[in-house]
Amino acid sequence: MFPSLFRLVVFSKRYIFRSSQRLYTSLKQEQSRMSKIMEDLRSDYVPLIASIDVGTTSSRCILFNRWGQDVSKHQIEYSTSASKGKIGVSGLRRPSTAPARETPNAGDIKTSGKPIFSAEGYAIQETKFLKIEELDLDFHNEPTLKFPKPGWVECHPQKLLVNVVQCLASSLLSLQTINSERVANGLPPYKVICMGIANMRETTILWSRRTGKPIVNYGIVWNDTRTIKIVRDKWQNTSVDRQLQLRQKTGLPLLSTYFSCSKLRWFLDNEPLCTKAYEENDLMFGTVDTWLIYQLTKQKAFVSDVTNASRTGFMNLSTLKYDNELLEFWGIDKNLIHMPEIVSSSQYYGDFGIPDWIMEKLHDSPKTVLRDLVKRNLPIQGCLGDQSASMVGQLAYKPGAAKCTYGTGCFLLYNTGTKKLISQHGALTTLAFWFPHLQEYGGQKPELSKPHFALEGSVAVAGAVVQWLRDNLRLIDKSEDVGPIASTVPDSGGVVFVPAFSGLFAPYWDPDARATIMGMSQFTTASHIARAAVEGVCFQARAILKAMSSDAFGEGSKDRDFLEEISDVTYEKSPLSVLAVDGGMSRSNEVMQIQADILGPCVKVRRSPTAECTALGAAIAANMAFKDVNERPLWKDLHDVKKWVFYNGMEKNEQISPEAHPNLKIFRSESDDAERRKHWKYWEVAVERSKGWLKDIEGEHEQVLENFQ
């Protein structure tokens, strides 16, 4: 009796203590929230930052507040197959000759009879804040994204720009309505203070210095593979020593169709108009960031931030300048082409403006709000490539921190701080971010103001394998079903799925590999295959993270300071290690638990409280461009960002209530060590057997390579 009574007393005390803790935490959070509200009431306005995010399959504008919440937003999903339709979205005029059609009901959005899906395979429904792109006769009914040949991916430069303006106009119109309600209730209105940009990298656009318009009506997108012959010919005629020398300069394996260098060479070799403009010194080269900033600034700023410039294959990582040897390697005469100035990720680029040809297409309402913005000289002052922006938005600032974005593919970045590490294990070296105005403030190190580097690894197929299960095998009805179905079985039943539909990327780098499903038996079910598909993505993320850690403790072991910086966060060295995740597949608790189980107990998987990490990263970059910390509209420094975005205004050592950020979730491994190692061994064997598949197809190798991907 007495032991039971004793346990009851202990339990009651613990319950009361924990309840008191929760109450205290809740009161502190409410106090912090009310303090900020009172501060806002004493202000003439509440500051916001506009973030433009141009992705491979969609564009969006989000107006962020201090908590990293979207006060107003608008998104346009690109169409690739529609043939005609109205352009009423966000205020663009529809040409009188364009046939109009009624907008379908939400849930039944279709283009040419086919459902529309996001890059991660999720069904898209048109809402007030999200529109499906329809086509404009002014652009000959061409969509933003085109696939003219197998392996070819093109974007329409002017339509990219129009989509951005549409999204911004719609966000501002929504903000007008919100502000009217706030003023009526005695609250100060919101006000946009500055703008940042995040964009898909490597995509190459060429335009005329004289007219400011594209030389040809398409840009070559990052995942286009038309340059494979150029790349292979280059490397067959380049010594191994020279290849290593170029790798040291760029951090990139230039034996790849990814980077801008081979795309520029293709334009000059295959497009007479581009060749003519080049010979006449009228050719301007840029990636998407350069194109947008040039067109959207009154000053026609011709710049590229370091995170984008580092993906061209022309920039020297040591100098952060264009390198003559790299330009000469690709046969580019620097005197005949205009290259953008390489700048930091966080500085004033120019004042917001809109080209006249776009302004003429607008209806009165969007035209008015945009003109008001133009009159205010709103500064554009933050820019990051999408993966770097995601890293910043995940607050992965410390050396050794890692983030993984699960989209169509999977991109993992590992922060190496101010140290440039050239990978010996299949990863790329790239710029993470450069915020030059971050000075020592609030105990932060002054090194934060220096350029930061990262190791990067990419998985070719992530969300795309879920689409394949849905559309090709019809194992699932919706992409959201893959997690629950995979979790109906405790493991894959011996099945290993290597999703190498377009070869293997980091750390294997084998374009000749192809997808394989191994280990099936009569015991195998649809659930086993679904789980094996998810595990195939997660195993590749583990392989990349292990490769990056090997680099950090290999080359980095020569530098004691570097080891001390990463010792508390690096993979397989400390239980404090965290992999920050975002993107479509990260929404699934089941998928993220599988990822945590595969990584093991040394790595926690942390899902961000904000769904828009990439756009948030661009907003942070714009905020930090103000040199005076007291002029920064939302956050004084990076610690302040974490305080408000992750801890709801509380200090990080105070406990945060899960209710404050329901999407902030930590996944920890629940797997058995022996089982985890056994499944990893199965994976390694399966990968080896999937490699070189195309090489073994006699007489077909060269033709298949031409259509690779």
UniProtKB/Swiss-Prot annotation:
InterPro entries: ATPase_NBD, Carb_kinase_FGGY_CS, FGGY_C, FGGY_N, GK1-3_metazoan-type, Glycerol_kin. It catalyses: glycerol + ATP = sn-glycerol 3-phosphate + ADP + H(+). Substrate binds at T56, R201, Y258, D386. One of its GO terms (molecular function) is ATP binding. Its EC number is 2.7.1.30. One of its GO terms (cellular component) is mitochondrion. ATP binds at R60, T408, G463, G584, M585, S586, R587, S588. Belongs to the FGGY kinase family. This is Glycerol kinase. The lineage of its organism: Eukaryota, Fungi, Dikarya, Ascomycota, Saccharomycotina.
